[in-house]
Amino acid sequence: MKAICFYFQIHQPFRLKNYRFFDIGNDHYYYDDFANDEIITRIAQRSYLPANAMLLEMIKQYGKKFKVAFSISGTALEQLEIYVPEFIESMKDLADTGCVEFLSETYAHSLASLEDPDEFVAQVKDHDKKIFQLFGKHPVVFRNTELIYDDDISAMVQNMGFKGVITEGAKHILGWKSPNYVYSSPVAPKLKLLLKNSKLSDDISFRFSNSDWASYPLTADKYIDWIASLPEEEQLVNLFMNYETFGEMQPRESGIFEFMKALPRFAAEKGIEFFTPSEVISKMKSVGEMPVMHPISWADEARDTSAWLGNTLQQEAVKKLYSIGERVRLCQDRRIKQDWYYLQASDHFFYMSTKHNEDGSVHSHYSPYDSPYTAFTNYMNVLSDFMIRVQEQYPESIDNEELNALLLTIRNQSNEISQLNREVEMLRNNIVKDTTGDFPVDKPAAEEKPTKKAPAKKSPAAKKPAAKKTTKKATKK
């Protein structure tokens, strides 16, 4: 029996305002609030909200027989909370159905997995906290920014406790193999890989309304027939796409919503099920290893990282940004931490691409700038001001060795505090047990005359105040 695995990406960056050279050192607010409000509100009204309503209607109609997964960046969630709070509520309704899974990713939709492993781990943890805070779900499957993946990343993902990762079924890593199987990482054998079926995904997200396409118009029954006609042993079809496919990239008038609504009915006729990524991982075995020595992604024709790191402008900007990572992680300034995340969004480097032809048109379509050079200049002006603010707290006179020593001290203190908190909790539990044991339950006299609670027996194990003092000292270090 075949299964379809749907995954939708939602991401919006905090776009930068026009930031001049003369603003450096004087203006510490970098964002175009009007553009951010207008863009996410428009997309939510055209796409996110009606698509959520569509999915909720489908789940009510088909129950557990229809399931999907989402990956929503932290920066998108923040903007949706500010500008379109009704989206968060509608997503909570979807989460409550039990038919929607939330995937993990980097909070800032960043390139940290390629540049800064410590930052990568920190962002993934922050993202998952945000998902649990809003939707009450703990992600167990990981998807990196723009499906960026290689063997080194798989090792980090497995170490964070994830059971699987989804990425692009790039032709140059597949060779003769099919994306319609579950694979595993050669360096993280417990981590299962789910590969995007690029053709079938792009048939919906990019070609659906293209009247010049040989298969136009695409109907639900035709599409399900394509999946059903795949070789019998190919049991899985991963359909990964941007959520804007519904209503934004493919307008409502194209029939995209009606197409989606009809899929479960025709799938059921062919015996095709819908699985979430975690269900795929639990129900399907890996058929073998899939080595990925160099990073891949789902962007551009090359399916590599050249969309963000393909020219000297991009490389210089990324290098400058991550050169201050350790210093930023030492900062306690909330605004600096926030700006650090917002400036890491991969979109800023995507706008700097100098590619031509079809790839170039995609980059220019999404960019708010006239040229890649304008994008670079504006970003570097902002980054220069940001670096000044960081250096005011941790000057360049403090070398990396001293910084590493500070980081080590902070980590040791954090571990010590965690250990002390565990000890305090154990002592508290022991005190509760001792107190409970002091009350005899079989004496009638206890019922006739109320008595004051006896104090807990003092024993060497119950020196709680001393533990508190130790905790305070550890905190002040």
What residue spans do the PLM features occupy?
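Short, well-structured secondary-structure segments
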Residues: 3-8, 14-17, 21-116, 140-143, ...
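Active-site and substrate-binding clefts of carbohydrate-active enzymes
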Residues: 1-49, 181-182, 186-191, 195, ...
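Metal-dependent polysaccharide deacetylase catalytic core of the NodB/CE4 family, i.e.
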Residues: 72-146, 189-209, 234, 238, ...
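Catalytic domains of cell-wall/extracellular-matrix polysaccharide-remodeling enzymes
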Residues: 125-179, 245-263
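Alpha-helical scaffolding within the catalytic cores
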Residues: 53-54, 82-95, 174-188, 221-227
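Flexible loop/turn segments at secondary-structure boundaries
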Residues: 13-15, 76-80, 110-112, 148-152, ...
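Generic structural signal for well-ordered alpha-helices
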Residues: 52-56, 88-92, 121-131, 154, ...
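Intrinsically disordered, polybasic Lys/Arg-rich low-complexity tracts
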Residues: 433-477
